[in-house]
Amino acid sequence: MTINLSDFRFVAKAISNKGHRPRELARTMPAHPLSYMELPFDPEYTLYNSRLTPEALNTASDDEMYWAVRSNVIFRHTGELPIEISGPDAETLLNRVFTRSVSKVKPGRCSYQFACYHDGGMITDGLLLRIEKNKYWFAQADGDLFSWYKANSKNLDVQISDPDVWISQIQG
């Protein structure tokens, strides 16, 4: 008997831990701190940026979800991963990584950006927030941009870190 794994969809389900210590997956694939809000909707989770994010809510059909966003407002907890880039050379690094100049982004403002390899292949996209003159957060879609920051930061005075924040979206 041959089983074709492409015929299956693998998801993570939220189950009660009954006060026991967290299992390994809880430490290596964290869920959004507000994911308890999704539990009444019987969510199925998938990995996005090494974080668990809801892929489906089993108490609502795809059509119901579509119309909820079109005619109402939803509060969605996402797997977008913010990375903090700070230091005197932060702007220089980001101008190496992104295709659009970040020099024009003023503190307190955002800019849509996308990162490409040197040959033009796209790595990922997201929103860049300039928090201060030398401090940025980039909320990225799924992709390995952290390694690309590190590869391009040689001889630059920058710090690249996870600011330990999670993103929620208001849609509709």
List the predicted regions and their residue ranges.
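Long, hydrophobic/aromatic-enriched structural stretches that serve as scaffold segments
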Residues: 119-124, 131
